[in-house]
Amino acid sequence: MVDSLDTATPARRRRSDARRSVDAILNAARVVIGERSDASMEEIATTAGVTRQTVYAHFPSRDALIAALIEAAAAEYAALLDAAGLDTAPPADALAQFLDAGWRFIRRYPLLLDPTATGIPRPTSNDPHDVVPPRLERLIQRGQRMGDFDGSLHAAWLAAAVIGLQHAAAAEVADGRLTAREAAALCLESTLRLCGSSARPTASR
């Protein structure tokens, strides 16, 4: 029994060390590639505080690292949406929280909106292209049923338009035409008007 515990502890420690290395590498990749989409594996290793060999031990190629980063980003965005109260908060509040989750995600993963970045894969799970529209559509439908949103327009169309508005606002920030604060405020106001909201988010009252 003692022998099995003695061997299990180093194994757990190695797994824990490996997990920390992977997390450090992914976080470094998020930051470095977010600043410069063509950053090298050497630069990522330096930022992560590990050797290039350690990076390659976990990710055999830069493409593999990017794919893992995209998977992590998709999971993080899904968690942000889960925490946003989209199905429970008052509709106007939920809509504001949906947009806020998007802004936080964009700030953490600017790579995803970088027009110079090429070869960005789609995630295999929690793909925002698949996950986000139906969740937003469900929120808008709830607001329409409650009378908080205008019910004369199709919820799927409104969801697509809201997503497009936020992408457009993010592009304005990336091009230096708006500050992040200005873009967030304009996007929220435009979204509420688009949905015909008869209520205002609690935070903006």
Which role fits each region the language model picked out?
Residues 59, 64-73, 116:
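Alpha-helical DNA-contacting segments of helix-turn-helix folds
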Residues 1-35, 39-47, 64-67:
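Basic, helix-initiating cap at the start of DNA-binding domains
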Residues 113-118, 126, 130-133, 145-190, ...:
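Hydrophobic/aromatic-rich alpha-helical bundle segments in the mid-to-C-terminal region
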Residues 69, 73, 77, 98-102, ...:
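Hydrophobic/aromatic residues within well-ordered alpha-helical segments
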Residues 68, 79-108, 121-124:
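Hydrophobic alpha-helical connector segments
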Residues 49-59:
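Short hydrophobic/aromatic patch on the recognition helix
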Residues 64, 103-138:
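Short secondary-structure transition hinges
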